[in-house]
């Protein structure tokens, strides 16, 4: 591992941090250390990192801005690549937008709305990066990334880089081909938006933000929606009907504000959250006969 660290530093891939606690990089404020954390400063840095990871036969994981993520208390083995600083380029040409995978999604939706571009209003309250949003087909307010993405530039495990079209991304509810068949890193996304009325777009975005503020507990560390909605039901409704609102294990609590959110009240461990998730699954299965599946990504040792 020491030799790998030395080569990563010599290759100038970006910031190289050893045994770096990941709690500070997740919106849940939970997570043990990464053996090696890389914050690449350019695409070449990511490519070189993957070359060295392959050379040393080391496991690797990619995170964005740490939303929709629960990291194990034991941390993550191998190399963790955090997208951000080196992938925040943006190019807007009429209604076509090309943007780096590390660009903050809320910042992008706000900026484009002010330019009178419609289509990203749903993302006005979704924390995280463009890359993470494309990876999991993030959505809200009856829309999602699949409605606006035309193609995405992906760096695959074998080091090749290629564009995947909308069809090749194989989008479904909170899922893409990158989670199922072709693991890779979203370097860039191209969105097709519509030219609209600026005042109306900004108004819709503000309503979405207000709704989130009034119904979701973003004043506490959390990872967003914990469970996928089991059609035709809503996960939050089932959890609340089961009487679990406010239930707490350790420092993790099912939000009083929204049943599908687990908040860190202070000092929560990943195990606290996992115990709550298991309790919810079993309770909903017993009471309603409905199987619950997590939307939050659980990673680590």
Curated annotation (Swiss-Prot):
Family matches, as PANTHER family: UDP-N-ACETYLENOLPYRUVOYLGLUCOSAMINE REDUCTASE
HAMAP family hit by this protein: MurB
Pathway: Cell wall biogenesis; peptidoglycan biosynthesis
Compartmental location: Cytoplasm
Molecular function GO terms recorded: FAD binding; UDP-N-acetylmuramate dehydrogenase activity
GO cellular component term of the entry, any: cytosol
Chief location: cytoplasm
Source organism (scientific name): Bacillus cereus (strain ZK / E33L)
UniProt keyword terms in alphabetical order: Cell cycle, Cell division, Cell shape, Cell wall biogenesis/degradation, Cytoplasm, FAD, Flavoprotein, NADP, Oxidoreductase, Peptidoglycan synthesis
TM spans (from-to): none
Assigned EC number: 1.3.1.98
GO biological process: cell division; cell wall organization; peptidoglycan biosynthetic process; regulation of cell shape
Active site, per annotation: 174, 225 (proton donor), 295
Enzyme class: oxidoreductase
Homology family: Belongs to the MurB family.
Task of the protein: Cell wall formation.
Top-level taxonomy: Bacteria, Bacillati, Bacillota, Bacilli, Bacillales
Designated name of the protein: UDP-N-acetylenolpyruvoylglucosamine reductase 1
């Amino acid at each position: 591992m020491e030799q790998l660290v030395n080569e990563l530093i010599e290759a100038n891939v970006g910031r190289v941090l050893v045994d770096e606690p990941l709690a500070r990089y997740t919106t849940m404020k939970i997570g043990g250390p990464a053996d090696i954390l890389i914050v690449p400063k350019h695409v070449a840095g990511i490519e070189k990192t993957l070359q060295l990871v392959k050379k040393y036969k080391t496991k690797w994981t990619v995170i964005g801005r740490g939303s929709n993520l629960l990291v194990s208390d034991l941390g993550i083995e191998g190399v963790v690549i955090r997208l951000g600083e080196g992938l925040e380029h943006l190019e807007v040409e009429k209604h076509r937008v090309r943007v780096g995978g590390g660009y903050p999604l809320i910042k992008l939706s706000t900026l484009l709305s002010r330019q009178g571009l419609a289509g990203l209003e749903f993302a006005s309250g979704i924390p995280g990066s463009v890359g993470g949003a494309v990876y999991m087909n993030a959505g809200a307010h009856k829309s999602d990334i699949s409605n606006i993405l035309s193609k995405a530039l992906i760096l695959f495990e074998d080091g090749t880089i290629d564009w995947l079209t909308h069809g090749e991304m194989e989008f479904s509810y909170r899922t893409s081909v990158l989670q199922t068949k072709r693991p890779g890193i979203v370097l860039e996304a191209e969105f097709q938006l519509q030219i609209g009325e600026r005042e109306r777009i900004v108004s819709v975005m503000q309503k979405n933000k207000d709704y989130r503020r009034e119904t979701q507990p973003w004043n506490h560390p959390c990872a967003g929606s914990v469970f996928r909605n089991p059609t035709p039901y809503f996960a939050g409704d089932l959890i609340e009907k089961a009487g679990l609102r406010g239930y707490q294990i350790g420092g993790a609590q099912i939000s009083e504000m929204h049943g599908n959110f687990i908040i860190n009240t202070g000092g929560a461990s990943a195990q606290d959250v996992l115990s709550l998730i298991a309790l919810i699954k079993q309770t909903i299965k017993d009471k309603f006969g409905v199987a619950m599946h997590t939307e939050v990504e659980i990673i680590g040792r």
